[in-house]
Amino acid sequence: FIIYSSLKSYIDLFIYKKSDIVEQFGKLDLINMAFQNCYLNSKKTESYFLNLINDPQSDYSRYTFFYLSNEVSNNDLATVDNFADTIDPLRSSLLISQVKKWIDEKKYTKLTQHFSCQNENDILAEFFFLISNFYSSQSRFDYSNIYLNISNYLNPKFYFNLSLIAENYQSNNNYDLAKKTFEKFDDKDEIFFWYKTKTIARIIACLLYTADAADEHFG
Protein backbone atom coordinates (compact mmCIF):
# COMPACT_ATOMS: atom_id res chain seq x y z
CA PHE A 1 0.00 0.00 0.00
CA ILE A 2 2.82 2.41 0.84
CA ILE A 3 4.60 1.78 -2.47
CA TYR A 4 1.35 2.05 -4.43
CA SER A 5 0.35 5.31 -2.71
CA SER A 6 3.76 6.87 -3.27
CA LEU A 7 3.90 5.86 -6.93
CA LYS A 8 0.38 7.20 -7.48
CA SER A 9 1.44 10.54 -6.00
CA TYR A 10 4.36 10.67 -8.46
CA ILE A 11 2.15 9.77 -11.43
CA ASP A 12 -0.27 12.53 -10.42
CA LEU A 13 2.68 14.90 -10.07
CA PHE A 14 3.96 14.14 -13.57
CA ILE A 15 0.50 14.46 -15.13
CA TYR A 16 -0.95 17.44 -13.27
CA LYS A 17 2.30 19.21 -12.33
CA LYS A 18 1.34 19.67 -8.71
CA SER A 19 2.17 17.92 -5.45
CA ASP A 20 -0.79 16.63 -3.49
CA ILE A 21 0.63 14.30 -0.82
CA VAL A 22 -1.60 13.33 2.08
CA GLU A 23 0.78 12.96 5.02
CA GLN A 24 0.42 9.46 6.43
CA PHE A 25 3.81 7.76 6.14
CA GLY A 26 6.04 9.91 8.34
CA LYS A 27 9.53 10.58 6.99
CA LEU A 28 8.70 8.92 3.66
CA ASP A 29 6.22 11.73 3.04
CA LEU A 30 8.92 14.30 3.78
CA ILE A 31 11.29 12.60 1.33
CA ASN A 32 8.61 12.45 -1.35
CA MET A 33 7.66 16.08 -0.79
CA ALA A 34 11.29 17.14 -1.11
CA PHE A 35 11.63 15.48 -4.51
CA GLN A 36 8.21 16.55 -5.73
CA ASN A 37 8.86 20.17 -4.82
CA CYS A 38 12.26 19.88 -6.46
CA TYR A 39 10.58 18.58 -9.62
CA LEU A 40 8.26 21.59 -9.57
CA ASN A 41 11.19 23.92 -8.88
CA SER A 42 9.34 25.14 -5.81
CA LYS A 43 10.86 27.59 -3.34
CA LYS A 44 10.04 25.07 -0.60
CA THR A 45 12.56 22.58 -1.98
CA GLU A 46 15.49 23.83 0.08
CA SER A 47 13.61 23.69 3.38
CA TYR A 48 12.38 20.15 2.73
CA PHE A 49 15.86 18.87 1.93
CA LEU A 50 17.47 20.69 4.85
CA ASN A 51 14.86 19.33 7.26
CA LEU A 52 15.82 15.84 6.13
CA ILE A 53 19.56 16.42 6.21
CA ASN A 54 19.44 17.99 9.68
CA ASP A 55 17.10 15.42 11.21
CA PRO A 56 18.49 14.71 14.72
CA GLN A 57 16.97 11.24 14.99
CA SER A 58 17.96 9.56 11.73
CA ASP A 59 20.73 9.75 9.15
CA TYR A 60 19.37 11.31 5.97
CA SER A 61 22.71 12.72 4.87
CA ARG A 62 22.27 10.96 1.50
CA TYR A 63 19.89 13.74 0.51
CA THR A 64 22.78 16.18 0.66
CA PHE A 65 23.61 15.00 -2.86
CA PHE A 66 20.18 15.89 -4.24
CA TYR A 67 20.00 19.17 -2.37
CA LEU A 68 23.38 20.30 -3.70
CA SER A 69 22.64 18.98 -7.18
CA ASN A 70 19.56 21.17 -7.26
CA GLU A 71 21.53 24.19 -6.02
CA VAL A 72 24.05 23.64 -8.83
CA SER A 73 21.17 23.45 -11.32
CA ASN A 74 19.99 26.81 -9.98
CA ASN A 75 23.54 28.15 -10.29
CA ASP A 76 23.78 28.93 -6.57
CA LEU A 77 27.42 27.88 -6.27
CA ALA A 78 28.04 30.02 -3.20
CA THR A 79 25.51 27.96 -1.24
CA VAL A 80 27.08 24.78 -2.59
CA ASP A 81 30.58 25.84 -1.52
CA ASN A 82 29.45 26.96 1.92
CA PHE A 83 27.58 23.72 2.55
CA ALA A 84 30.50 21.60 1.35
CA ASP A 85 32.72 23.32 3.92
CA THR A 86 30.56 21.77 6.66
CA ILE A 87 31.01 18.20 5.38
CA ASP A 88 33.46 16.01 7.28
CA PRO A 89 34.57 13.35 4.77
CA LEU A 90 35.85 11.09 7.55
CA ARG A 91 32.37 10.89 9.06
CA SER A 92 30.38 10.83 5.83
CA SER A 93 29.12 8.13 3.50
CA LEU A 94 30.99 7.28 0.31
CA LEU A 95 28.53 9.31 -1.75
CA ILE A 96 28.77 12.46 0.34
CA SER A 97 32.56 12.19 0.64
CA GLN A 98 32.69 11.98 -3.15
CA VAL A 99 30.39 15.01 -3.41
CA LYS A 100 32.69 17.04 -1.18
CA LYS A 101 35.71 16.09 -3.27
CA TRP A 102 33.95 17.17 -6.46
CA ILE A 103 32.95 20.49 -4.96
CA ASP A 104 36.39 21.14 -3.48
CA GLU A 105 37.80 20.54 -6.97
CA LYS A 106 35.12 22.82 -8.52
CA LYS A 107 33.68 19.91 -10.52
CA TYR A 108 30.14 21.14 -9.97
CA THR A 109 28.70 19.56 -13.09
CA LYS A 110 29.42 16.12 -11.62
CA LEU A 111 26.41 16.66 -9.37
CA THR A 112 24.07 17.27 -12.29
CA GLN A 113 25.46 14.59 -14.62
CA HIS A 114 24.04 11.78 -12.52
CA PHE A 115 20.68 13.15 -11.39
CA SER A 116 18.16 15.84 -12.25
CA CYS A 117 15.01 16.76 -10.36
CA GLN A 118 13.42 17.58 -13.71
CA ASN A 119 13.95 14.04 -14.98
CA GLU A 120 10.99 11.87 -14.04
CA ASN A 121 12.95 8.63 -14.39
CA ASP A 122 15.66 9.95 -12.07
CA ILE A 123 13.13 10.78 -9.36
CA LEU A 124 11.41 7.40 -9.62
CA ALA A 125 14.81 5.69 -9.55
CA GLU A 126 15.59 7.33 -6.23
CA PHE A 127 12.22 6.24 -4.83
CA PHE A 128 12.92 2.62 -5.80
CA PHE A 129 16.40 2.90 -4.27
CA LEU A 130 14.76 4.01 -1.03
CA ILE A 131 12.58 0.88 -1.04
CA SER A 132 15.61 -1.25 -1.89
CA ASN A 133 17.58 0.22 0.98
CA PHE A 134 14.72 -0.50 3.38
CA TYR A 135 14.61 -4.17 2.39
CA SER A 136 18.39 -4.40 2.68
CA SER A 137 18.22 -3.04 6.23
CA GLN A 138 15.76 -5.86 7.01
CA SER A 139 18.19 -8.42 5.51
CA ARG A 140 15.69 -9.18 2.74
CA PHE A 141 18.37 -9.00 0.09
CA ASP A 142 16.44 -10.63 -2.77
CA TYR A 143 13.69 -8.01 -2.52
CA SER A 144 16.31 -5.30 -2.14
CA ASN A 145 18.05 -6.37 -5.34
CA ILE A 146 14.78 -6.42 -7.29
CA TYR A 147 14.02 -2.80 -6.44
CA LEU A 148 17.62 -1.78 -6.90
CA ASN A 149 17.65 -3.25 -10.40
CA ILE A 150 14.52 -1.23 -11.21
CA SER A 151 16.25 1.87 -9.86
CA ASN A 152 19.35 1.22 -11.94
CA TYR A 153 17.24 0.60 -15.05
CA LEU A 154 15.47 3.95 -14.62
CA ASN A 155 18.65 5.90 -13.94
CA PRO A 156 21.81 4.03 -14.94
CA LYS A 157 23.73 7.31 -14.60
CA PHE A 158 23.51 6.99 -10.81
CA TYR A 159 25.71 3.91 -10.72
CA PHE A 160 26.87 4.73 -7.19
CA ASN A 161 23.82 2.79 -6.01
CA LEU A 162 25.50 -0.38 -7.24
CA SER A 163 27.51 -0.33 -4.02
CA LEU A 164 24.33 -1.43 -2.23
CA ILE A 165 23.74 -4.44 -4.47
CA ALA A 166 27.41 -5.40 -4.05
CA GLU A 167 26.99 -5.20 -0.28
CA ASN A 168 23.84 -7.33 -0.54
CA TYR A 169 25.83 -9.97 -2.41
CA GLN A 170 28.51 -9.89 0.26
CA SER A 171 25.91 -10.33 2.99
CA ASN A 172 24.74 -13.47 1.18
CA ASN A 173 28.36 -14.65 0.85
CA ASN A 174 28.07 -14.32 -2.92
CA TYR A 175 31.56 -12.92 -3.26
CA ASP A 176 31.99 -13.50 -6.99
CA LEU A 177 28.95 -11.37 -7.89
CA ALA A 178 29.98 -8.76 -5.34
CA LYS A 179 33.43 -8.54 -6.91
CA LYS A 180 31.98 -8.25 -10.44
CA THR A 181 29.68 -5.45 -9.30
CA PHE A 182 32.48 -3.49 -7.64
CA GLU A 183 34.54 -3.77 -10.83
CA LYS A 184 32.12 -1.30 -12.45
CA PHE A 185 33.63 1.56 -10.42
CA ASP A 186 36.68 3.18 -11.98
CA ASP A 187 39.22 5.77 -10.88
CA LYS A 188 37.32 8.80 -12.19
CA ASP A 189 35.30 8.67 -8.95
CA GLU A 190 38.17 8.47 -6.50
CA ILE A 191 36.27 7.73 -3.27
CA PHE A 192 34.28 4.86 -4.76
CA PHE A 193 37.38 3.54 -6.50
CA TRP A 194 39.21 3.50 -3.16
CA TYR A 195 36.31 1.65 -1.56
CA LYS A 196 36.17 -0.78 -4.47
CA THR A 197 39.90 -1.54 -4.17
CA LYS A 198 39.70 -2.05 -0.42
CA THR A 199 36.59 -4.22 -0.60
CA ILE A 200 37.80 -6.41 -3.47
CA ALA A 201 41.00 -7.07 -1.51
CA ARG A 202 38.86 -8.18 1.43
CA ILE A 203 36.70 -10.36 -0.84
CA ILE A 204 39.78 -12.05 -2.31
CA ALA A 205 41.06 -12.70 1.20
CA CYS A 206 37.71 -14.30 2.12
CA LEU A 207 37.77 -16.47 -1.01
CA LEU A 208 41.33 -17.60 -0.30
CA TYR A 209 40.45 -18.38 3.31
CA THR A 210 37.42 -20.40 2.18
CA ALA A 211 39.52 -22.30 -0.36
CA ASP A 212 42.23 -23.04 2.22
CA ALA A 213 39.62 -24.22 4.72
CA ALA A 214 38.11 -26.54 2.11
CA ASP A 215 41.52 -27.95 1.20
CA GLU A 216 42.28 -28.58 4.85
CA HIS A 217 38.92 -30.26 5.41
CA PHE A 218 39.04 -32.52 2.37
CA GLY A 219 42.79 -32.87 2.15
Language-model segments: what does each one mean?
Residues F1-E183, D187-A211:
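Alpha-helical solenoid repeat scaffolds
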Residues Y209-G219:
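Single conserved hydrophobic/aromatic residue that forms the stacking wall/gate
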